[in-house]
Amino acid sequence: MILREQIDFLIHKRQDDNNNNGEAITDDDPFSSSSWRWGRWIFFIFFIVALLILLFSTAKVNRRRRIMGQAPIRGTAWLTPPTYRQSERDYNGTQRCVEDYVPEYTETANENDLGFYDERGEFHPNGKTEYLAPPPLSEEQASSTDKDLQRPVAAVVRIPSESEFDFNLLRPTMNNFVNGQSNRNEQHSPTVESSSFDVNNAPARAKVSK
């Protein structure tokens, strides 16, 4: 009897007013209504927006913590972009831990030390680290090196001629210009007679007859 009541509660029977045929219309999915269909899409959009806001804020907080020298929030380190060195190690495949070489510590200066400081702070260099001169070259090596050396060819230098360059450093005036022109004409054409021309003497004005 209880089972029958539960079945009647889940299966809703309604009779169509227009068609009095007594057919039972079952509605097994109560969430298939139009109002709930729009509501779940709106709820999904709100969920996605809240998730994006959470991820963005977490990445921003991790970036601020990294600038301050702190570790990122636990479980959210994958949100923080890798640094330049970290990405370089990942690209080159050198993820293994490389330890820096540390020489062996001894109470006295060994052959790997340059020296030591005493109690007064004075530095005492190690005699084993002094500069050793290279061995002298043998006569055969010295003669072979002298033969291999050759004197380089002398560089060709162009000698400027007087006709191309004028070394007269006087201020350019009319007299200097005329003298320079006359000198050039004498050098290039010696047969041409030089005529005397005085620039300062201006020609007399012609008289007009009345």
UniProtKB/Swiss-Prot annotation:
Residues 175-199 have a biased composition (Polar residues). It is a single-pass membrane protein. The chain crosses the membrane at residues 41-61. The modification Phosphothreonine is found at residue 191. GO terms for cellular component: cytoplasm; fungal-type vacuole; fungal-type vacuole membrane; intracellular membrane-bounded organelle; vesicle. It is found in: Membrane. Signal peptide: none annotated. It comes from the Eukaryota. Present with 1230 molecules/cell in log phase SD medium. This is Protein RCR2. The keyword Transmembrane applies. To yeast YBR005W. The keyword Transmembrane helix applies. Residues 125-149, 175-210 are annotated as: Disordered. GO terms for molecular function: protein-macromolecule adaptor activity. Keywords: Membrane, Phosphoprotein, Transmembrane, Transmembrane helix. GO terms for biological process: protein localization to vacuole; vesicle-mediated transport. It holds the Pfam family RCR. The modification Phosphoserine is found at residue 161. InterPro entries: Chitin_synth_reg_RCR.
